[in-house]
């Protein structure tokens, strides 16, 4: 099944991750810690923890670092006592954006998120204003050059929801969020190491953007991701490879 290329999106994201490795690791550790605090330290009995660990491993976090985060969360460390909040809004060009946060101070967090939206030509919306446009899914992405037939055989046997082969040869494997970590483990065992893997909110319909608007939306997403309390940012913007190249 062919689709529009998402490889450009992944390359853009990976470049930012490489440049901000410390901040990314901080967010991943926070997710592992909270997952362990809420659901216990046994990943086999805690799907959220299992998914958090899978994402951390995909980002090359060491097993020792992961284990320390699990122990910290499962032990009820006071510093792990943060709450999860979600904000929704619109960016430039009417792009729908979801911002997931973990915070010990809601007032601080909402102020920072609102400021980022306002300064970037967007606006913070109400609960539910854009969430209906997205579906929670696991996405495991592979770079161009992966053996498509072999990957498809293993993935289908593992129970994936969908497999999308893009025009540039990159492949996205979609899973139910509850099956994400189990399927990723199967793929790794069979020798298929992904370029990116995460449980995310996938937009049902993508917003097509011109170069100027795409640049503004990217700037907003960057501002949001730079906030300490922000864990993840999702949008329905269609950042095509052509747009990425034009923006540079």
Swiss-Prot record:
Q: Where in the cell is it found?
A: Cytoplasm
Look up the domain of life of the source.
Bacteria
What's the chief localization of this chain? cytoplasm
A Pfam family the protein falls into: Transcrip_reg
Q: Tell me which Gene3D superfamilies the record gives.
A: 1.10.10.200, 3.30.70.980
Q: Which UniProt keywords apply?
A: Cytoplasm, DNA-binding, Transcription, Transcription regulation
Q: Which GO terms describe its cellular component?
A: cytosol
**UniProt record, GO biological process:** regulation of DNA-templated transcription
- Return the similarity comment: Belongs to the TACO1 family.
What is the designated name of this protein?
Probable transcriptional regulatory protein FTM_1203
* Source organism (scientific name): Francisella tularensis subsp. mediasiatica (strain FSC147)
């Amino acid at each position: 099944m062919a689709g529009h290329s998402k490889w450009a999106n992944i390359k853009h994201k990976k470049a930012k991750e490489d440049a901000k490795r410390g901040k990314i690791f901080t967010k991943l550790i926070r997710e592992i810690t909270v997952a362990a605090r809420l659901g216990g330290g046994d990943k086999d009995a805690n799907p959220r923890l299992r998914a958090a660990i899978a994402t951390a491993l995909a980002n090359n976090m060491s097993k020792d670092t992961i284990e320390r985060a699990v122990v910290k969360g499962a032990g009820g460390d006071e510093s792990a006592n943060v709450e999860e909040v979600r904000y929704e809004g619109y960016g430039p060009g009417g792009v729908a954006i979801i911002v997931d946060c973990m915070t010990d101070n809601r007032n601080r967090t909402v102020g920072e998120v609102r400021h980022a939206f306002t300064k970037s030509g967007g606006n913070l919306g109400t609960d539910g204003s854009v969430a209906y446009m997205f579906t929670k899914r696991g996405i495991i992405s592979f770079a161009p050059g992966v053996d498509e037939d072999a990957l498809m055989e293993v993935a289908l046997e593992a129970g994936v929801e969908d497999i999308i082969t893009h025009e540039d040869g990159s492949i996205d494997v979609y899973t139910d969020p509850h099956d994400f970590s189990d399927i990723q483990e199967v793929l790794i065992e069979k020798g298929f190491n992904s370029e990116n893997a995460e449980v995310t909110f996938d937009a049902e319909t993508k917003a097509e953007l011109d170069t100027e608007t795409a640049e503004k939306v990217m700037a907003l997403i960057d501002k949001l991701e730079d906030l300490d309390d922000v864990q993840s940012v999702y949008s329905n913007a269609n950042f095509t490879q052509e747009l990425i190249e034009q923006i540079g």
